[in-house]
Amino acid sequence: MDRCKHVEQLQLAQGHSILDPQKWYCMVCNTTESIWACLSCSHVACGKYIQEHALKHFQESSHPVAFEVNDMYAFCYLCNDYVLNDNAAGDLKSLRSTLSTIKSKKYPCVVPSDSVLHPVDAQDRVYSLLDGTQSLPGNEDPTCAALWHRRRVLMGKAFRTWFEQSAIGRKGQEPTQERMVAKREAKRRQQQELEQQMKAELESTPPRKSLRLQGSSEEAATIEIVPVRAPPPPPASPAKDKAALPTSEDRTFKKVSDSLIKRRPMVTPGVTGLRNLGNTCYMNSVLQVLSHLLIFRQCFLKLDLNQWLAVAASDKARSYKHSAVTEAAAQQMNEGQEKEKGFVCSRHSGLSSGLSGGASKGRNMELIQPREPSSPYSSLCHELHILFQVMWSGEWALVSPFAMLHSVWRLIPAFRGYAQQDAQEFLCELLDKIQRELETTGTKLPALIPTSQRRLIEQVLNVVNNIFHGQFLSQVTCLACDNKSDTIESFWDLSLEFPERYQCSGKDAASQPCLVTDMLDKFTETEALEGKIYMCDHCNSKRRKFSSKSVVFTEAQKQLMICHLPQVLRLHLKRFRWSGRNNREKIGVHVVFEETLNMEPYCCRETLNALRPECFLYNLSAVVIHHGKGFGSGHYTAYCYNSEGGFWVHCNDSKLSMCTMEEVRKAQAYILFYTQRVTENGHSKLLPPELLSNSQHPSKETDASSNEVLS
C-alpha cells in the first residue's frame, strides 16, 4: 500500500522496546519467530502464522500499525495491507536504519573507564544521571540496568539507616517494634500450647501391644537403677565467667556457620533457565544440552583455564623461576576467583511449580553476568566453567549469560550480532573452538603450568575429542571384478537425509511420519555411483601387465557402515533443503524416535564381532527442537533429561517446565543426542578416574551459592 493515513498519524514513543534486542520475543508465548512490535505502544507479539498474539493486541487496543523486527516491514491492520509510506518525522526510515545497525554492527566488549561503564539505551540514562554528569555515547552496546538497580538499593539502605537514627525515625519505629514484640509473644504462647497438647496426647496414648517391646520392657524393669547425686561444679571466678560469655564476633561466626549448614538447594541442580539476549535461543538450547551431558559437564566443572591463560600471556612471568610463578598463579586463582566469577543479582524469580523445590518467590533467583568480560583473556572453557557451576549449583533459577555471549562474539565472529543463527552450525563451531583452545593452552608455555594441571587439560581434551568421535567404513565395490576398497573416515555427528518420499512438498508427504531408523537405513544403504567414474586398482593392475593403454574407469557402488561407535551419538536431521537459487525451505515431517536406539543393524561385521550386544544400545539424553517454517527464522528449544531429578525438562530460554517422554516424542526434532548405555567397568570409558572422583555439583565456594549483589 503506497499511502496509509494511519501511518501519517503515527507518533513513535521514545525508548521503544523494539530498539532493545533482549525484548525481541512475544510477551505472551515467548517465541522469537515472526516478531511484530506495536508502534503505538511497547507491546511485542508474534504474527498470524504463529499464534496471532499481535492481531489479538490490535483487536484489544485498536493500535493499527505494527512493525516486523527481522524483515523490517510495516503492516496496517485497519487497511489490511503492508505499508510503504512514512510519517512526517520519518520514524519508519529511522527505525529501519537503527535495526540494520543493531543487526550488522560488530559489538566490542566495553572496558570500564574512570569506574563508569557506558550504557546505551534510554533506561540507562537514569543510571548515568545517578552516577554523574557524564554524557552517554550512542554507539556502545551494553546496558547497566542491573548496576543502576544495585546502586539504587544501596542508596536506599544508606538513607534508611540515616533516617532510623534520627528522632523522627526512632519515634516512627516505636509502634513497629511494639507490634513485633507482641507478635513474638503470641508466637511463643502458641508454641507452648502446642507442646503441652502434644505432651498430653502422648501421656494418654495406650501402650503398644508389640511382644518384642513388651519383652524388652520386662527386661528393663528388672534392672535396678540407683540414683547418684552428681558432685556440684567448682565455683568459677568472675573473670572466667566473663570470658565464657560469647562475644559479638563469636555470635556473628555462629550465625554465618548456621546459615551455611542449613542452606539447601532452592532448585533442582541443572534446572536453570538462560535468558534470551536477542535471538540467542540457538546458543541457549546448545548450552543446555551440553550441560546435561554428564561427561562433558564434569570436565568443565573441574577445569578452569582462565588463570593459566593469564600466566601464559604475561611477559613478566617469563623472567621468574618455575616455582615462584606456579605459586603466584595458584595464589591468583584463589584470591581472584570470586572477582572473576562476578555476577549481578536481579529480582526476577520463578520457575514452573514442581521444579523450584519450594523456592521462595521473594528471593533473588536470577544471575546477570557482567556486561564486560570476566577476564581480559577470552576463553570459552572458562565461561563454560563459570556457567555450569551456576546452572548446577541448585541456587539460581535464571541466568543472563552476557559474558558467554561476548566471548562467542569475540572468538566466533560468524555469530556476532543479533541475527538468526543455526543451532547445528553453532554447536560444531563451539566444539571446534573449545578443542583448539585446549590444544593451544596445553602447549603454550608448559613450564609455567603445573604438571597436575597439564595432565587435567590433556584428560579434558581427550574427552572433548572422543565424546562425539566415531568412525565409519566407506566401502566401494567394483561391479566389474567385485573388488572391495575400504576406507576408514571419522565423524562427529551423522547428518541424516530424509527418504525420497519425504523430499516433495506435498501435504501427503508431510502428513506421514518418518522413522529415525528409516533415515539411518538410508544413510547405510548401498548407493550406485552414476556412470563409469570409479578407477579400480584391481582392474587396472591386471590390465597394466598386458597393455599400455590409459586408465580404465568402471561402474561401482558405495556403502557406509559404522565401525566405531561414539560415547554420545549426535544425529543431525537435515530438515532444510534448497528450493530455487537462494531459498532454503524446511521439511516439516514429524520424525518418530524412541528413548532407546539399537545401532547394531548399522555397524560393519568386524564391529559386530568385537563388541557385546549391550554396547550397541543408546539412551536418549537430549533433543534440540526447531520451531517455525523457514531457515532464516524460527525458534530453538531443547528437551534435556535431568539425571539429578530423574525427569525431562523443556528448556525454552528462561522458561523451564517439567515434561514427560510422550511430550518429547511429539516434538519436531532437529538434533538428537543419544548416550551409550553400557560401559566396560561401570562408568564412562572416556572419563578419567580423576574426573570421576569429582562431584557432580559445584563447590559451595562459588558465587552461585551467594546472594550478595556484586558490581
From Swiss-Prot:
Its predominant location is: nucleus
PROSITE patterns per UniProt: USP_1, USP_2, USP_3, ZF_UBP
Give the InterPro entries listed for this entry.
Answer: Papain-like_cys_pep_sf (IPR038765), Peptidase_C19_UCH (IPR001394), Ub_carboxyl-term_hydrolase (IPR050185), USP_CS (IPR018200), USP_dom (IPR028889), Znf_RING/FYVE/PHD (IPR013083), Znf_UBP (IPR001607)
Query: Do you know which Pfam families this protein is assigned to?
Result: UCH, zf-UBP
- USP domain span: 272-677
**Reactions listed under catalytic activity:** Thiol-dependent hydrolysis of ester, thioester, amide, peptide and isopeptide bonds formed by the C-terminal Gly of ubiquitin (a 76-residue protein attached to proteins as an intracellular targeting signal)
Can you tell me which residues bind Zn(2+) 3? C38, C41, H57, H63
> Zn fingers (UBP-type): where?
2-99
Please describe what happens when the gene is knocked out.
USP44-deficient mice show a significant increase in skin tumors when compared to wild-type mice. In addition, they are prone to development of spontaneous tumors, particularly in the lungs. USP44 loss also causes chromosome mis-segregation and aneuploidy.
Q: In which tissues is it expressed?
A: Widely expressed. Highly expressed in lung, pancreas, skin, liver, stomach and intestine.
Q: Extract one GO BP annotation from the record.
A: protein deubiquitination
Q: Where is this region: Disordered?
A: 170-251, 685-711
What does the sequence similarity comment in the record state about its family?
Answer: Belongs to the peptidase C19 family. USP44 subfamily.
Subunit description: Interacts with the N-CoR components TBL1X and TBL1XR1.
What protein name does the entry list? Ubiquitin carboxyl-terminal hydrolase 44
Q: What is the lineage of its organism?
A: Eukaryota, Metazoa, Chordata, Craniata, Vertebrata
Q: Which gene encodes it?
A: Usp44
